[in-house]
Swiss-Prot record:
This is Outer membrane protein P2. It is a multi-pass membrane protein. One of its GO terms (molecular function) is porin activity. Belongs to the Gram-negative porin family. PANTHER family: OUTER MEMBRANE PORIN F-RELATED, PROTEIN YDDL-RELATED.
């Protein structure tokens, strides 16, 4: 009998958590170590910003390590500490993308199984898991342009009802000036970085139905100290993300529709609007082998100004060689057409295809 797609998703894409090694378990305290090493061989013209030509590379693709400590107090109460690091290069010229160890997530949690949990620190927000589209490396959905999916935050999550997750987050500034210059004061939020924000969201995944929605209002520092023209600086983004899907359990098939809308308020300039729709699917081709893909149409426009339309498609196949070893082939193609007043239409294309291997531990 085919596995349900929920089991496939958990088994294939969250294996690092499921297979984490318990290194200490005594008197209500549990400590786990886990992570993955991930490498991809690819041909792409969009690995780096402003890249023009397509190149072949063998590089790091999200390798990370995490440690989680949980202390149970009794009566359903618990405290948890979580730290996750990434291997990231500081230099664009480092083609393998293996570099310094940085902190990706670091937070503490206080919670109760019946009342929910409060999370403090650099963590994922409720917006992170809203959309349903699957990808390993070349995701065509730019959710963070609508609502930030992680950051320095205070968050509350409730999971007391089977299949339902409710959440709210307050984001704080994470990037601040370290040195004094003519245009910067130490301790102030870096220009065009997040100043603060709020998010609320809900997601339901049960009885073969998937439904989710999140709303966020994010404020940015405008960079008013910059000399010259100060207009056009991002001040605030109001965004929403949603998903609706149905799981055909007997067929091993999930079909979904993701969408988003955002309005950006700019300093002394016209506002910008963007939206996208993205139908997608995930299908169990055979045991331990899955096929997935999605299409996206996105439009970005300024009142009586520049307009951009993007069509993008992603397709991939993954196969579990072992419960802790996943290999995949994934490709994506995107075409963006930009129109501006009295200017010739500009067309940009992004093409990527890669073969990846993940080893979890």
């Amino acid at each position: 009998m085919k596995k349900t797609l929920a089991a496939l998703i958990v088994g294939a894409f969250a294996a690092s958590a499921a297979n984490a090694a318990v290194v200490y378990n005594n008197e209500g305290t549990n400590v786990e170590l886990g992570g993955r090493l991930s490498v991809i061989a690819e041909q792409s013209n969009s690995t780096r910003k402003d890249q023009k030509q397509q190149h072949g590379e063998l590089r790091n693709a999200g390798s990370h390590f995490h440690i989680k400590a949980t202390h149970n107090f009794g009566d359903g109460f618990y405290a948890q500490g979580y730290l996750e690091t990434r291997l990231v290069s500081d230099y664009q010229s480092s083609s393998d993308n293996f570099g310094n160890i940085i902190t990706k997530y670091a937070y503490v949690t206080l919670g109760n199984k019946g009342f929910g949990e409060v999370k403090l620190g650099r963590a994922k927000t409720i917006a992170d898991g809203i959309t349903s589209a699957e990808d390993k490396e070349y995701g065509v959905l730019e959710n963070k342009e609508y609502i930030p999916k992680d950051g320095n935050s205070v968050g509350y999550t409730f999971k007391g009802i089977d299949g339902l997750v409710l959440g709210a987050n307050y984001l704080l500034a994470q990037k601040r000036e370290a040195y004094k210059t003519d245009a910067a004061t130490p301790g102030e939020v870096i220009a065009q970085a997040i100043s603060n924000g709020v998010q609320v969201g809900a997601k339901y995944d049960a009885n073969n139905i998937i439904a989710g929605i999140a709303y966020g209002r994010t404020n940015y520092r405008e960079d008013l100290a910059e000399l010259g023209n100060k207009s056009g600086k991002k001040q605030q983004v109001n965004g929403a993300l949603s998903t609706l899907g149905y799981r055909f359990s007997d067929l091993g098939l999930l079909v979904s529709l993701d969408s988003g809308y955002a309005k950006t308020k700019n300093y002394k300039d016209k506002h910008e609007k963007r939206y996208f729709v993205s139908p997608g699917f995930q299908y169990e081709l055979m045991e331990d082998t899955n096929v997935y893909g999605n299409f996206k149409y996105e439009r970005n426009s300024v009142d009586q100004g520049k307009k951009a339309r993007e069509h993008a498609v992603l397709f991939g196949v993954d196969h579990k060689l072992h419960k802790q070893v996943l290999t995949y082939i994934e490709g994506a193609y995107a075409r963006t057409r930009t129109n501006d007043k009295d200017k010739t239409e500009k067309t940009e294309k992004e093409k990527s295809v890669g073969v990846g291997l993940r080893v979890y531990f």
